[in-house]
Amino acid sequence: CSSDLILLVTTPRDSYIKITGPDGRKGYDKLTHAGNYGVEASMDTLQNLYGIDIDYYVKINFSGCVAVVDALGGITIDSEVEFTCGEDASPIPYHFVKGPNECDGEMAVAFSRERHAFAAGDFQRGRNQTAAIKGILQKATSPAILTKYSAVLDAVSDMFLTNIPTSTISDLVKLQLSDSTAWNIQTYSIEGTTQPPAGQGPAYLEITGLRGASVVYPYADSIN
């Protein structure tokens, strides 16, 4: 915590990497499929990809995200681009400007779900989801929220799953209250290509059962 740094890394869900499957067996597949085998499989997959230790997780769905953002009293999301949500993301066509946007829970989820409005598709959606998480962290670490964090947690405790001990959360809150230095939240997105590397064309995808599926091959230098 001495660096006051939070690094948010976006890994495309369609990344074709070595994942942890049933009984700990490893094989190449899309990252999102690791989730079929539980949170631990997803954590192990990302640990192997980045060569780091991952101790904790937070798992939340769309309804939980709405509840968390609303419990915080809304958040500010800094959008890279201006766009309007389509029906796949939200029944309400929310419009977002480039720069700061004040969002309630429903707007934050719509912002995080949209992908058809962008030429970069899911890559931009991943960056938007990171921007939304950054907005949540900035609001959650503000003095106004920290001084009543117990009430906020109680309001959303059944909306997400985590293995972070309550004592650890309490220690982090006390640390932040004693040192009001704002966290330096940085974001980074893994880049890749949808074009198979040499020797991994349509026939290869047919063999692996991924022909016709959306697959991203991450750039090695982007991961490193």
Regions found by a protein language model. Name each.
Residues 1-224:
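Non-catalytic, solvent-exposed segments at the cell envelope interface
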